[in-house]
Design a protein with these regions (language model features):
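Short coil/turn segments at helix-helix junctions and helix-capping linkers
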Residues: 7-19, 53-66, 101-110, 154-159, ...
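HEAT/HEAT-like alpha-solenoid repeats
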Residues: 2-6, 36-55, 88-99, 125-148, ...
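Charged/polar, solvent-exposed surface patches and flexible loops
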Residues: 10, 25, 29, 52-56, ...
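Eukaryotic acidic, Ser/Thr-rich intrinsically disordered low-complexity regions
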Residues: 2-6, 173-249
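Extended alpha-solenoid helical-repeat scaffolds
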Residues: 12, 18, 25-33, 77, ...
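Short, flexible/disordered secondary-structure transition segments
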Residues: 19, 37-38, 65, 106, ...
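Eukaryote-skewed repeat-based solenoidal scaffolds used as protein-protein interaction platforms
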Residues: 60, 71-186
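Extreme N-terminal segments of fungal proteins
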Residues: 1-85
């Protein structure tokens, strides 16, 4: 299976825009042929190789409008897997692992398009959760485990803090866009953020997670913001006191 993905890997990272565009269209058709539960699945390694190529496909794209269009196209590739829960979870995981791995190599001139891609993928993830049903605890559990394991990991020192900050900054923005009726299981969605407040070793990350939980828009989902602010600050202060005590123990 890996050999079949090799042409896409080379063409998607080409400096020729027409070749990249053609390769992306061919890739969509290829992925559709492997999207059903009865088809031969792509391995985790195949998905990581594809995402590395897609990462550099965006890397090579210039002009902001074209970059945004491509980022949206990359997010829409997720829809190919809509009927296969196993692969769609693996697809999201490969995306986040790729972004985390390549983050340090993104220069300042290219950062904006990747920040936009991440925004697209946070939104797409929530859209997929909505399409599966907000009451689908099994799927939601697996999806938010991916977020908690990679971009919002509390303990993994290999995850860049910059990635954590950006996801926290846009988390409620994208939830608001997807769940206009405020029907989503908000506590399940906020669980990765709460885990950061309680378990992260980084003080700045903890504070930023607390700010996310104190977003006034969360009132629309029934979150008690006043209590949340106090509770978050108490947890942050307690965690920092424990760290200070440990330093002098």
């Amino acid at each position: 299976m890996a050999q079949q993905t090799n042409p896409f890997i080379k063409q998607l990272a080409s400096s020729d825009r027409k070749l990249r565009t053609s390769a992306l269209a061919s890739l969509r058709s290829y992925l559709q042929s492997h999207s059903t539960p009865s088809s031969t699945p792509l391995s985790s390694l195949d998905l990581l190789k594809l995402w590395k190529a897609l990462f550099y496909c965006l890397y090579m794209q210039d002009k902001p409008l074209h970059q945004q269009n491509l980022a949206n196209d990359l997010a829409d590739l997720t829809d190919v897997w809509s009927s296969n829960d196993e692969v769609v979870i693996a697809w999201f995981e490969a995306f986040w692992q790729t972004i985390a791995r390549e983050w340090s190599g993104i220069d300042g001139l290219r950062m904006d398009k990747y920040l936009y891609l991440i925004r697209c993928y946070i939104r797409k993830g929530l859209e997929v959760c909505e399409s599966k049903g907000w009451s689908n605890e099994e799927f939601l559990g697996r999806y938010f485990e991916v977020l908690q394991a990679v971009p919002l990991s509390a303990r993994d020192t290999k995850i860049p803090d910059g990635l954590r900050y950006h996801v926290l900054d846009i988390y409620v923005d994208e939830l608001e866009k997807v769940d206009g009726k405020h029907e989503a299981p908000i506590e399940r969605i906020l669980e990765p953020v709460r885990s950061l407040v309680k378990n992260t070793v980084g003080k700045v990350v903890r504070r930023r997670a607390g700010e996310c939980l104190a977003d006034e828009r969360l009132r629309e989902w029934g979150v008690e913001i006043v209590d949340a602010k106090k509770k978050t600050n108490d947890v942050v202060d307690e965690a920092e006191e424990e760290e200070d005590d440990a330093e002098f123990a």
